[in-house]
Amino acid sequence: MTTLADLRINYSRASLDEADAAPDPFAQFDRWFKEALAAKLPEPNTMTLATVGADGRPSARIVLIKGVDERGFVFFTNYESRKGHDLAVHPQAALLFYWIELERQVRIEGRIEKTSAEESDRYFASRPLGSRIGAWASEQSAVIDSRATLEAREKAVSERYGDNPPRPPHWGGYRLVPDSIEFWQGRPSRLHDRLLYTRDAAASPGWTISRLSP
């Protein structure tokens, strides 16, 4: 059996100090995301989305972030998927960005709301044709009997809508409105830097910053 105890990296690329951190977590996220882009990391927009179902079971999966502004973090999916059902009963979620090459993580927690129909329509129209057809063909998270069934549905949707499939009513966006955002920078000897931004209406610019023990 593979031995895992000796698999370790001593992080030493950078530090994260309160004096250097932006007072607003969205500005800090933008700074780190731009650095991930500049480092040419593969798909720096990938994140883990964690949800909880009606039975209390947690579930996590990788999704793509498609928008960030002062309102929150936006992603799109099938509302009838497992995550969609989870978010319908528990509209709270957590996101995790992990940029191992930069020895960084960003952890985000908050409430979930659906984006407007206009936002969902606009993003759906920007997707490649195959992805728009796939949104109709796939009953995401449902059991199917074979790959052939999925491909038959894809063909039927393509024949029905041609080059202009509309957005399915079961497909659209969610926005996570954060109440906390943690920035983690790996440091030597596991004494990592962790800065936690917590929403605070009484603070300026609406967030307090705390250092967490690693």
From Swiss-Prot:
Cross-referenced PROSITE patterns: PYRIDOX_OXIDASE
Gene: pdxH
Residues where substrate binds: 8-11, 66, 123, 127, 131, 190-192
Superkingdom as given in the UniProt entry: Bacteria
Record's protein name: Pyridoxine/pyridoxamine 5'-phosphate oxidase
Pathway annotation from the record: Cofactor metabolism; pyridoxal 5'-phosphate salvage; pyridoxal 5'-phosphate from pyridoxamine 5'-phosphate: step 1/1; Cofactor metabolism; pyridoxal 5'-phosphate salvage; pyridoxal 5'-phosphate from pyridoxine 5'-phosphate: step 1/1
UniProt record, GO biological process: pyridoxine biosynthetic process
Protein species of origin: Burkholderia cenocepacia (strain ATCC BAA-245 / DSM 16553 / LMG 16656 / NCTC 13227 / J2315 / CF5610) (Burkholderia cepacia (strain J2315))
Reaction(s) catalysed by this chain's protein: pyridoxamine 5'-phosphate + O2 + H2O = pyridoxal 5'-phosphate + H2O2 + NH4(+); pyridoxine 5'-phosphate + O2 = pyridoxal 5'-phosphate + H2O2
One Pfam short name: PNPOx_N
